[in-house]
């Protein structure tokens, strides 16, 4: 029997690999001769960098970059030496969690630190990039990131237009001659799970701006500024990605990646499953095990476990899911390629007790053992 395990992290309790290894131990208790492969799993959002560092023998690279409100922040990315790949989350450098609610200012917030992370990875030798862009604090169209990478944004007086959302309307000329030449050799894949265009009522400012501090009175102003920036970009580069699905992601960062860096935007789970080479292991798998901290209706809507399950079904494998907790709505997962799912809790306890790492590991192992005794 070949068993492939790819389970998302149980946030605050077990990492993806820790959960996978706990399941492996349980399977081996029931099936000592089983061939078992454990792969890291994430959806391109929070925790993706950590999952791939741990699951693909990566190295954590710590660095100090310019934060969203221009003060230095500690950020990090993953370095996968074998493939010269950098795995990073823009939120590490310009995330909304780095900005207290009372200091949010979309007119000033910058993505400059994201560009600094990319520069650092390029200098280290990385030529492949996997970048998650969820959880941003910015609405600057990616101007900050691009400035860090060498692009100049000039106003009508041919001086620097500044940074943040306030700079967008001032841009009169764009000079890309200083763009880091190493980017010509780079292949950038962006994990993007939103389809919003750059501008308009479904664009970045109107949909995501309010959570970043955009007031009702600022929406029209910032959206028009974003459209102006897109127009100057199109005039300069001869491309138009303004209405491309995902262009509005991360305050227009999606647009910047498409227009200036030749990146591809891919649903997060698809990108991660490809990066970890999961499908290659599924061709001869008998059973696939997946799961996450909580199985519910959102899981069935296409979160990481369902992505694994659907891929497994292409190869006719049975799919089992384990979770810390399971809601009534999780029954929808059975219609989304998960054959059976099981909560791992074994007795009534507090949330803190359930999330204790040692307890969760023991529960995961015990549940896996009992389930696999039936197979």
Which residue ranges define each predicted feature?
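N-terminal loops that bind phosphate or other acidic moieties
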Residues: 2-133, 137-375
């Amino acid at each position: 029997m070949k068993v492939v395990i790819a389970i998302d992290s149980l946030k605050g309790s077990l990492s993806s690999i820790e959960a996978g290894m706990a399941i492996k131990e349980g399977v081996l208790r029931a099936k000592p001769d089983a061939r078992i492969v454990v792969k890291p799993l994430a959806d391109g959002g929070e925790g993706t960098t950590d999952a791939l560092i741990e699951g693909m023998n990566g190295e954590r690279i710590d660095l100090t970059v310019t934060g969203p409100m221009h003060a230095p922040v500690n950020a990090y990315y993953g370095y996968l030496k074998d493939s010269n790949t950098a795995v990073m989350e823009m939120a590490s450098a310009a995330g909304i969690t780095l900005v207290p609610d009372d200091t949010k200012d979309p007119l000033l917030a910058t993505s400059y630190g994201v560009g600094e992370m990319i520069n650092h990875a390029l200098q280290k030798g990385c030529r492949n990039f996997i970048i998650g862009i969820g959880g941003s604090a910015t609405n600057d169209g990616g101007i900050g990131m691009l400035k860090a990478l060498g692009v100049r944004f000039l106003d009508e007086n041919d001086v620097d237009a500044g940074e943040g959302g306030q700079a967008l309307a001032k841009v009169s000329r764009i000079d890309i001659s200083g763009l880091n030449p190493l980017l010509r050799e780079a292949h950038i894949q962006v994990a993007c799970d939103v389809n919003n265009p750059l501008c308009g009522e479904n664009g970045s400012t109107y949909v995501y701006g309010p959570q970043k501090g955009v007031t009702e009175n600022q929406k029209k102003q910032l959206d028009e500024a974003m459209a102006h920036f897109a127009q100057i970009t199109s005039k300069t580069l001869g491309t138009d990605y303004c209405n491309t699905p995902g262009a509005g992601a991360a305050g227009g960062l999606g647009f910047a990646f498409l227009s200036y860096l030749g990146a591809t935007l891919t649903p997060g789970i698809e990108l991660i499953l490809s990066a970890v080479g999961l499908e290659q292991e599924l061709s001869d798998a008998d059973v696939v095990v997946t799961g996450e901290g909580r199985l519910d209706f959102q899981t069935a809507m296409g979160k990481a476990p369902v992505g694994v399950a659907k891929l497994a079904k292409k190869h006719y494998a049975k799919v089992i899911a384990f979770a810390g907790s399971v809601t009534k709505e999780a029954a929808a997962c059975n219609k989304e390629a998960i054959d059976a799912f099981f909560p791992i809790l074994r007795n009534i306890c507090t949330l803190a007790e359930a999330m204790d790492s040692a307890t969760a590991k023991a529960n995961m192992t015990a549940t896996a053992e009992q389930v696999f005794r039936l197979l």
